Amino acid sequence: MRIALGIEYDGNGYFGWQRQAEVDSVQAQLERALSIVANEPIGVFCAGRTDAGVHATGQVVHFETHAIRNEGAWTLGVNANLPDNIAVRWVKEVDDSFHARFSATARRYRYVIYNHSFRPGILRHGVSHYHGDIDADRMHQAAQALLGEQDFTSFRAVQCQSKTPFRNVHCVNVTRQGMYVIVDIAANAFLHHMVRNIVGSLLEIGLGNQPLTWMGDLLALKDRNQAAATAKPHGLYLVDVTYPEQYQLPKLALGPLFMLD
C-alpha cells in the first residue's frame, strides 16, 4: 500500500532533507523511524527537498509498505522513534497514482525575519535576524514583479540542476507583524535557493539600498551575479503543498507556530 505523511521539522542541525553518506538528514531519520514501525526497509519521496538549516511545517512525503497499520499506529509509532525536532502531523493511505513530488501543483514558503536592533536568543534558529530599518510595504510592492511564469535565472543557485529556469509564481506577499517581517510566496515549484535569493534582493529594496523596480530589472538581466546575496537559511519554512482535491489530504494551520495565521 501507499501511505502519505505530513511532517514538520526544525532543520537546524541537519544537512538538509536529502539522505547523504556520513551526515545527518531529515530523510534518514524519517526512514529509520518508519522502518522500525513497518518492520521492513522504507524509502520515502518528498514534495520538496529543503536545504541545511531550513524548516518545514507542511512537508509531504509518501512511501510504499507491506505493513498493515492504522493511522494512529503509524503516527504514534513513528513519532516515538523520531528525534524531538521531527514530527508526523498526519497520516493517510492514498492510491497508487499519488506521488508527493509529481502530484503536487504548488508549494508555499514563508520566510520570517526578526527585525530588531538586538539578535534573538530563544528563536535564533527559527528566524533570520536583520537589524536595519526594513520597509515591508516597499518589499511587497517590489515583489509583485515576480508574479506569473518567468525566467528566474537571476534567483537560482549556480549549482541548480533544474533543466529550465522558468517557474510560475502564484502569489507573493510581504507583511509586518510587530518585529517580524514575513515573506509569503507560492509557486508551482521553486529552483534551488530561489526563495532565499528572492528574499535577499527584496531586503535590499526594503532597506532602501535599491529602487522599487529592481526585482523586475534583475529578472530581465538573467544573471545571478547581479542580484543580492542569498538570505540566511534559518528563517525559511516550507509551510504548505497543494494537491488535487481527489486525494483529500488533510489541511492544517500553516505555521510556524509562533506566528499568527
UniProtKB/Swiss-Prot annotation:
EC number: 5.4.99.12
Enzyme class: isomerase
Oligomeric form and interacting partners: Homodimer.
GO molecular function, a single term: RNA binding
Reactions it catalyzes: uridine(38/39/40) in tRNA = pseudouridine(38/39/40) in tRNA
Gene Ontology biological process: tRNA pseudouridine synthesis
Binding site for substrate: Y109
Role played: Formation of pseudouridine at positions 38, 39 and 40 in the anticodon stem and loop of transfer RNAs.
Record-annotated membrane-spanning stretches: none
Protein's name according to its UniProt entry: tRNA pseudouridine synthase A
Domain of life: Bacteria
Stored NCBIfam families: hisT_truA (TIGR00071)
Keyword entries, A-Z: Isomerase, tRNA processing
InterPro entries membership: PsdUridine_synth_cat_dom_sf, PsdUridine_synth_TruA, PsdUridine_synth_TruA_a/b_dom, PsdUridine_synth_TruA_C, TruA/RsuA/RluB/E/F_N
